[in-house]
Structures are given as structure tokens and as C-alpha cells.
From Swiss-Prot:
The keyword Nucleotidyltransferase applies. It catalyses: N-acetyl-alpha-D-glucosamine 1-phosphate + UTP + H(+) = UDP-N-acetyl-alpha-D-glucosamine + diphosphate. It comes from the Eukaryota. This is Probable UDP-N-acetylglucosamine pyrophosphorylase. CDD domains: UDPGlcNAc_PPase. It comes from Schizosaccharomyces pombe (strain 972 / ATCC 24843). Gene3D superfamilies: Spore Coat Polysaccharide Biosynthesis Protein SpsA, Chain A (3.90.550.10).
Length: 475
């Protein structure tokens, strides 16, 4: 808001924020220091835009309309790899054209862990944290590229961009420093912070954290576009000559921060955006889906699709599959040109309402309240909300097996799924499959761990043929 709008009562009135106007005037008369503090926060708001986005999001959520089969259809899915993509991806890495970007703003609260998720240690041999595991994979991708293209410049690197939130920033940066950036040159690690949006009550009024502070929350993974621009990360990519960026969620323990095959596919097809998916098999599975709508890709939540569309099937090579089966696993490819354009249009992203229990300060009663039930909304934008700006011809939907690509760490051990134990088992099982595929000998109960320092995707294990492997770590 500009100075003129700040004291225009009609703007506060038409956007249901009179309590904010009244509090500003109260502090202006009674406490100038607190007034300036609150004023500085209000100046960051565009009340008209916020109110419009809130009303649109509210209307959409109340409408609760289900999409029919005529409104959404399957995207063309790439589910087999061209053998040339691996080498093409390694070539782009060797040329210094590739960067990794991790969305690491989440806390480990649901894991029973007091810290950023990326700092969580899985209990594998040598006890690496999630961040360290990803660093090992980045270094291995670079080593493979250098070996495949030894004539390229030796000083090339894979820069790692790490999006943190206000609550994870300090601890994440300290963790990297304490661990010497896990062997990656610190000049190749770029931390940047996602933005925040104000919390609202059920009627759309801004909530207060104190008498002179608004209640804020991270703005969702869609905040990546604006944050890349404002932090200087995009300028850094441009300076380095980055053309290809893979973005992923920190909590997928099987993730490949830089996947040569995926990058090779996107490079060969000259795509603006691509995403990895896994096949949805159960119509009742609660997962977002990549679909085509009006010749544009988009992600829809399971709750937005009619039962008829959810259960629709098609026959592929004599086997029945769900028609809408491309399940989103939050792993995306972006061309640098797309990110540049997206960063300039981030203000057009819609907001989504997450109903939560939000402690707040009541400026009328002057009491701080901790609610027992959900009382308001945290506002989020989603990274995939800009996907519809891309034509299906410039978008790639790449289907990968769950067992090799997706094992999210979401819950504590009290939950039967997506917990620490399931993640460790998935890592060990994948390594075991590589050993057996290469002719190694294992007992059924063996717990041998194949480190990313040894193999990224099962390559370079030919030496193990005919050898007995037992409960060890392969480096």
C-alpha cells in the first residue's frame, strides 16, 4: 500500500479490514514505536488484491464442484526411456548447464523431530542426514558427467539452490556450515527464503500476532517464483549459464536432485516444464493428478475429480489402467527461460486456503488466544499453479516406478506409512535390486546399503557379478 492508501478508510472498509485501520490509528495516538512497526507490515500488503484472492479461493472451496471426464483428460505420458537421454543429460551437466533446487522450508514436526526436515538423520550406515544424502547424489551426478565428457571444462559444477522458510533458514544454514557443506564448494550452494502471507480469520480479516504485529505464515511452494527473483538466485543462474533446473521436495528420500535421464528427455524434446509422476493404481488414493484441461497441463486434487472420472479406465497393451493415473510427486523440470517468465507473473498465482488453528491477538479485547479448533486460514500458492500457462506440446509428463523414485518422509513411526522405517526399507530395497541385477549374491534378509557415492542409479556395479555381498555398505 502507498502512503495515500494507508489512511484511506474506505479501502480498509471495502476489504473487511477496518480492525486494522482502527489499530493503526490507536497506536498512532498512543505508541509511535509500535505504530511504525505495524505500519511497516501493512505497507507490504495489497489489501484489494488480498481480498479478491481470498474471495475467489473461498468461492472455489465452497462450490465443491467435481470435474467430469469431459473437462479433464490424461496427458500424454512418457513411460519409457530413450537410451540416448542418459548421455544427453550428462552432456548438459558437463557443460555446466544444470542446477538442482530443493524446496526445504518444512519443519520435521510431524516426524517428532525439532528441526528442518532436511537435517533429519535416517539411520543408514554413517548416519547421513537427508541433506547429506542429496549432496552425495549431486556430487555423483557431477562425477559421472565429468567421466563421460572429460574434454569439458574441469571447473564446472552443479549449483544447489535451497529454498528455506523463515522458520528453517537459520538452522539450515548453520547445519550446512557445521558439516562443511557436505563436500560441495560453498560458492555453489545458494540459500534463499520463500515469502510469507498474512493469516486470515474465517471471515477474511487479517489476524494479529501481537498488538503491533500481524500473523504471517510461509506462502507455499508457489512462492518459489517470486523468491528466485527477489533473492538474486535467478541472476546467479543467468551468470552461470544455467539452462535446466530440477526442483524437488526435500522429504523424498529416493529423489535424484539431478537426474541425467530426466534432463536428457527435457533437453531432447525442448520442453519448458516437465514433471515426474508415478502411476496411480487405486482410484481412492488421495493424491494430486497431472491432467490435461483445455489443451493445457494442470494438477488437480483428488477431491476435485468426480467418481466417474476417478474410476475411468483405458486399455494399454492389453492391461487395464486408470485413465487419470499420473500422480504428482513434486519433482519438476524447468527451463531457465520459463522460470524467468514465471517470476514476472507470480502475482497472478491464486491462493489456496488451509484451515488451521492459528493463535492470535484480539485487538478488541486485548487478549492473546490459543484456539482449540481451526479458526482461520493460512494462505498458500502452489508451484504447479503456473503449469496451465504452458501448452501440452511444451510440457512433459514422465512416468517413473514408485520403488525407484518416490518414498516420502511425512510421518512419525506411529503411522504405518511414509515414516522413517518405510523410507530406510525403500532405500535398502532399491540398492538390493541393483546388486541382484548386476549378478551379486544376497541372502533374502540382507541389509546391504548402496551409497550414492558408489552408484547413482545402479550403474558401475558390474564388478559385483558373482560376488557374495552381506550386510555391508558399498561406497
Amino acid at each position: 500500500m502507498d502512503d495515500k492508501e494507508l489512511f484511506d478508510r474506505s479501502i480498509f472498509e471495502e476489504t473487511n479490514q477496518l480492525h486494522l485501520y482502527d489499530q493503526l490509528n490507536y497506536l498512532k495516538k498512543n505508541d509511535l514505536q509500535k505504530f511504525r512497526k505495524l505500519l511497516n507490515q501493512v505497507q507490504q500488503l495489497d489489501l484489494r488484491s488480498l481480498w479478491l484472492k481470498y474471495r475467489n479461493a473461498k468461492a472455489t472451496s465452497q462450490e465443491n464442484r467435481k470435474l467430469s471426464p469431459s473437462e479433464v483428460g490424461p496427458l500424454s505420458i512418457v513411460d519409457t526411456s530413450d537410451s540416448s537421454w542418459w548421455r544427453t543429460g550428462l552432456r548438459e551437466i558437463a557443460r555446466g548447464h544444470v542446477a538442482a533446487l530443493v524446496l526445504a522450508g518444512g519443519q520435521g514436526t510431524r516426524l517428532g523431530f525439532a528441526g528442518p526436515k532436511g537435517c533429519f538423520r535416517l539411520g543408514l550406515p554413517n548416519n547421513p542426514s537427508i541433506f547429506e544424502l542429496q549432496a552425495q547424489k549431486i556430487k555423483k551426478s557431477l562425477a559421472l558427467a565429468r567421466a563421460a565428457f572429460p574434454d569439458q571444462e574441469a571447473s564446472i559444477s552443479i549449483p544447489w539452490y535451497i529454498m528455506v522458510s523463515e522458520c528453517t533458514s537459520e538452522e539450515t544454514i548453520s547445519f550446512f556450515k557445521e558439516n562443511d557443506f557436505f563436500g560441495i564448494d560453498k560458492k555453489d550452494v545458494f540459500f534463499f527464503q520463500q515469502g510469507v502471507l498474512p493469516c486470515l480469520d474465517i471471515s477474511g480479516r487479517v489476524l494479529f500476532e501481537s498488538d503491533s504485529s500481524l500473523a504471517w505464515a510461509p506462502n507455499g511452494n508457489g512462492g518459489i517464483y517470486e523468491a528466485l527473483l527477489s533473492s538474486g538466485a535467478l541472476n546467479d543462474m543467468n551468470r552461470r549459464g544455467i539452462l535446466h533446473i530440477t526442483a524437488y521436495s526435500v522429504d523424498n528420500v529416493l529423489v535424484l536432485p539431478v537426474d541425467p535421464v530426466f534432463i536428457g528427455m527435457a533437453t531432447t524434446k525442448k520442453l519448458e516444464v516437465a514433471t515426474k509422476t508415478v502411476e496411480k493404481i487405486d482410484p481412492a488414493e488421495k493424491v494430486g493428478l497431472l491432467v490435461s484441461s483445455h489443451n493445457h497441463p494442470c494438477v488437480v486434487e483428488y477431491s476435485e475429480i468426480s467418481d466417474e472420472a476417478c474410476k475411468a479406465t483405458e486399455n494399454v497393451d492389453g492391461h487395464k489402467h486408470l485413465l487419470l493415473r499420473a500422480a504428482n510427486i513434486a519433482y519438476h523440470y524447468f527451463s531457465f527461460d520459463f522460470l524467468q517468465k514465471a517470476s514476472l507473473h507470480s502475482s497472478t498465482l491464486p491462493i489456496h486456503l488451509a484451515c488451521k488453528k492459528i493463535p492470535f491477538y484480539d485487538v478488541t479485547s486485548h487478549h492473546y488466544t490459543t484456539p482449540l479448533n481451526p479458526n482461520g486460514y493460512k494462505l498458500e500458492s502452489f508451484i504447479f499453479d503456473l503449469f496451465p500457462s504452458v501448452s501440452v506440446e511444451n510440457f512433459g509428463c514422465f512416468q517413473v516406478p514408485r520403488r525407484t523414485s518416490f518414498s516420502p518422509l511425512k510421518n512419525s513411526s506411529k503411522s504405518p506409512n511414509d515414516n522413517h522405517e518405510t523410507c530406510v526399507n525403500d532405500i535398502l530395497s532399491l540398492g538390493k535390486s541393483w546388486i541382484l541385477k548386476n549378478g551379486g549374491i544376497l541372502s533374502p534378509s540382507d541389509c546391504t546399503y548402496v551409497s550414492p557415492e558408489c552408484s547413482l542409479q545402479g550403474e558401475s556395479l558390474e564388478w559385483i557379478k558373482g560376488k557374495q555381498v552381506s550386510n555391508c555398505k558399498l561406497y
